[in-house]
Design a protein with these regions (language model features):
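Short acidic, glycine/serine/threonine-rich loops at helix termini
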Residues: 1, 24, 41, 47-51, ...
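Ferredoxin-like iron-sulfur electron-transfer modules
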Residues: 1-21, 38-45, 72-82, 213-215
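General beta-strand structural signal in soluble alpha/beta enzymes
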Residues: 38, 107-110
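Active-site-adjacent bridging/hinge elements
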Residues: 63-76, 195-215
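Thiamine diphosphate
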Residues: 91-96, 106, 116-120, 125, ...
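N-terminal leader/propeptide and maturation segments of large enzyme subunits in energy/redox metabolism
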Residues: 142-211
């Protein structure tokens, strides 16, 4: 699977109880000997404990950056087990987008199929990263104003971030050296999409230990 992944093995572990039987995976498999073959559910019950083991004990190992198609598929999808129709052509794209951007992703969902399987209360196919707890923020407006709705979500998030930045700058002198260093780094990387999550984690960790009342 590549030099950068030496020491690892890659496995597609199917959840038999969640497979919709559309056959797409078997159809598109390029191998001469198919890696995935559709079989009756009764014969695949042995895969259920294997799925549980892979989910709870193995999980995803994100040791490479998702900067190409292959590497993106080693990242945990933050969209899984939707109630979309079997073989739906939309869901693979949503899965891929969450693998690339899911931890900092906001979805303003126009009304349609994706708004139905995206929020079939009380369940949702969107989930969080198993390590960080971050995942897509999702909402839908019924009023055919999706562009304005999404713009409002983005503007709201921007205003909150700008407020945090302003409060840090105004109170910088009251913080300990550790918080000052973390806050300065966060402000410097304010618009750096590749660094902001790590900088945010460092700032939060420093603030949790801060004793200054302003914190």
């Amino acid at each position: 699977i590549g030099k950068e992944l030496a020491g690892y093995q890659f496995r597609i572990q199917v959840s038999p109880l969640d497979c919709t039987g559309c056959g797409n995976c078997a159809d598109v498999c390029p191998a001469k000997t198919k890696a995935l073959v559709l079989k009756p559910l009764e014969s695949q019950e042995v895969e259920m404990p294997r799925w549980e083991y892979m989910d709870k004990k193995v999980g995803y190992k994100q040791v490479v950056e998702p900067n190409n198609v292959k590497n993106s598929q080693f990242v945990q999808p933050l969209f899984e087990f939707s109630g979309a129709c079997a073989g739906c052509g939309e869901t693979p794209y949503i899965k891929l987008i969450t693998q690339l951007f899911g931890e900092r992703m906001m979805v303003a969902n126009a009304t349609g199929c994706s708004s139905i399987y995206g929020a079939s209360a009380p369940s949702t196919p969107y989930c969080t990263n198993y390590k960080t707890g971050r995942g897509p923020a999702w909402a839908n407006s019924l009023f055919e104003d999706n562009a304005e709705f999404g713009f409002g979500m983005a503007e709201g998030a921007n205003r909150l971030r700008e407020r945090v930045k302003r409060l840090l700058e105004e109170n910088m002198s009251a913080f300990s050296a550790a918080v000052q260093a973390a806050a300065t780094a966060w402000i410097a990387g304010f618009d750096d999409k590749d660094q902001t999550l790590a900088l945010s984690d460092a700032l939060l960790a420093a603030l949790e230990k801060e004793t200054a009342p302003v914190a």
